[in-house]
Swiss-Prot record:
Pfam families: Ribosomal_L37e. This is Large ribosomal subunit protein eL37. Binds 1 zinc ion per subunit. Binds to the 23S rRNA. GO terms for molecular function: rRNA binding; structural constituent of ribosome; zinc ion binding. Its cofactor is Zn(2+).
Length: 60
């Protein structure tokens, strides 16, 4: 068994599939949780303030 480049060719499964709620390719097939909207983890849509672009505040 070797590690490195030869082992990378064995990774063929799709980790994420299309989400039923948001439609993005973010639903983890094994964990059954969407990384984008939180489907499978919570009833509410996943949203955080750090994902939004903040307005530029003048420094002087």
């Amino acid at each position: 068994m070797s590690k490195g480049t030869p082992s990378m060719g064995k990774r063929q499964k799709r980790t994420h599939i299309a989400c039923r709620r948001c439609g993005k390719i973010s639903f983890h097939a094994q964990h059954k949780v969407c990384a984008a909207c939180g489907f499978g983890k919570s009833r509410r849509i996943r949203s955080y303030r750090w994902t939004e672009k903040k307005a530029k505040v003048p420094t002087h």
